[in-house]
Amino acid sequence: MKTLLIHAKHFEYEAREKALDAAESIDGNRSGSFENALVVFVTVEKGDGSSQDVVEEAAADVLDVFRRVGASRVVVYPYAHLSDDLADPEEAKRVLSQLAERISSAGVPVSRAPFGWYKRFSVECYGHPLSELSRTIKPGRRVRPGYADFAVMFPDGRIVGIEELRAEELPEDFVALLEAEVFKKKREGGEPKYLEYCRKFGFEWEPMSDLGHMRYGPEATIMLDAVAEYAWQCARSLGIPVYKVRGTNTFNLSFKPVAQHAQLFGDRLYQMEVDEKKLILRYAACHQQFAMVKDWEISYRDLPFGAFEVADSYRLEQPGELLLCFRLRKFYMPDLHVFCKDLAEAMEVSFRIHSKIYEEIRKLGRDYVSIYNLTRSFLEQHRDYLKRLVEMEGKPVLLHFVPEGKYYWVINVEYNIIDELGRPREIGTFQIDVGNAERFGITYVDENNTRRYPVIIHTAIIGSLERYVFAVLDTAAKKARAGEVPSLPLWLSPVQVRVIPHSSEYLKLADSIADKLEEQGIRVDVDDREESLAKRIRDAEVKWIPYVVVVGKREAESGKLTVRVRGQGQYEMSLEELVGRLVSELKGYPRVSAALPRYVSARPRYSP
């Protein structure tokens, strides 16, 4: 049996004509209209009638959901479209009748729509986390309803089962996370607007490579360089020594630690054979950093410390899952591993990482909803630690329980934004790894001159470079949807200031302004094209250039510049005031060179 349970604010149906010769008699039951009803769409499958367990299990499940959602009645609605393995009509009618009777015997009002009729129906779903559920119940197999692998932890330390949740105490974004991760609800499709913005800045698929591989045009490369530098800056801000390293992306499976670590990622690894050697492309920076750090002589006095690399990473994602700037087969991961003396030190360091991850997403005007993947034993032994993490978030988190000993980590936190289309998208992450130090032979010498295995934190504070860009562009898409002007942060904009002279007569003045701005590390260009002023201003707006400076006779005589600030308006200010404003806005962010010709007229035409 397959069931689809909808908690409906309003539900109505009307039987129109017979679909089967064995259709039930109407007998005044041609239509029905109900408020606050739990509507149970039921497909009876072959063999359901041979086992009373099926009816008992289905009824128990319906009654459980009925009580939790606070419905006023149950409507059993025959629905043949949830399975291809249909019971014969007589068996189906018998099972449906038994199901309704079993629910009714529990004192619950039940209505049953007629079997074997074409029916019109309309439903208005409440839309809370328990309002759309589906079940599969097989003969001879008792299936306990519920979601035993999940729970929710609140900032006050309460842990609540999924079935006990109340929608009114949950933030909207968290409900979206529950619907996707627990109830597997699919959001409506459609092309997200951020893809248009990807094309605008030169983030594209490379058609001459494998699926899932990108290319980055000049503007996209400036943005990616800025994000890479910023990721390094974030890593260094944690208050511990961090060493930047580099290495290879190819590892030999004949080495036991490489092979063991590779097994954790299954069929998502790129593999190749060269000179009769089986090689893999790295999944992240783990292989290289661990292979390197195992050769270091480490004292307990050196801990904690980090190793950092922006690693070209390779994951053989399914073709249907690929999404530009988000789910890729090749991407850049600013991977930080923090080596700690023990689990206690790792948990203490993780608070800094947790705080930094939230600080960075909030700089974009966004917030996360989190999934804590962990074992039940870790929950029981470290409940206070988890409570502190959740308190720092200030909102509930989803706990996902995994089998003991299956993974190299004891906790894996996934930080999700809810995108423009209402879907969770993981950006940042951290894990506490208790297995890889021993696997790779990484040790340190403790206070008693004993060699020990460190505990390792894996983290990508701002996510992969591409996913951070995704978060920025999705934020712009949300702004556009809200009727605001979409924009990039100033530090990330490929061109931060464009100077537009009224005519060639003022090109020298435009150049002198650009010189002053470049001295401050500001990316500036000059639109010297023989186009109308209006067209050049419009082109700057199309390219989302944050500051546009127009210079002509008035500006030359007055010493005041006419400055258009994207999304804010037009201002008059001196060059010194403009520089001061830009320097202030860029404080704390990296300065990356423009790598573009100053004159717009000197550039070839390409998509951005």
Curated annotation (Swiss-Prot):
GO terms for biological process: threonyl-tRNA aminoacylation. Coiled coil: none annotated. PROSITE patterns: AA_TRNA_LIGASE_II. The keyword tRNA-binding applies. GO terms for molecular function: ATP binding; threonine-tRNA ligase activity; tRNA binding; zinc ion binding. Its EC number is 6.1.1.3. Binds 1 zinc ion per subunit. It comes from the Archaea. It catalyses: tRNA(Thr) + L-threonine + ATP = L-threonyl-tRNA(Thr) + AMP + diphosphate + H(+). One of its GO terms (cellular component) is cytoplasm. Keywords: Aminoacyl-tRNA synthetase, ATP-binding, Cytoplasm, Ligase, Metal-binding, Nucleotide-binding, Protein biosynthesis, RNA-binding, tRNA-binding, Zinc. Zn(2+) binds at C286, H337, H458. InterPro entries: aa-tRNA-synt_IIb, aa-tRNA-synth_II, aa-tRNA-synth_II/BPL/LPL, Anticodon-bd, Anticodon-bd_dom_sf, DTD-like_sf, Thr-tRNA-ligase_IIa, Threonyl-tRNA_syn_edit_dom_arc. The N-terminal domain is an archaea-specific tRNA-editing domain that hydrolyzes incorrectly charged L-seryl-tRNA(Thr). Catalysis of tRNA editing is performed by the charged tRNA itself. NCBIfam families: PRK03991.1. Homodimer. This is Threonine--tRNA ligase. It comes from Thermofilum pendens (strain DSM 2475 / Hrk 5).
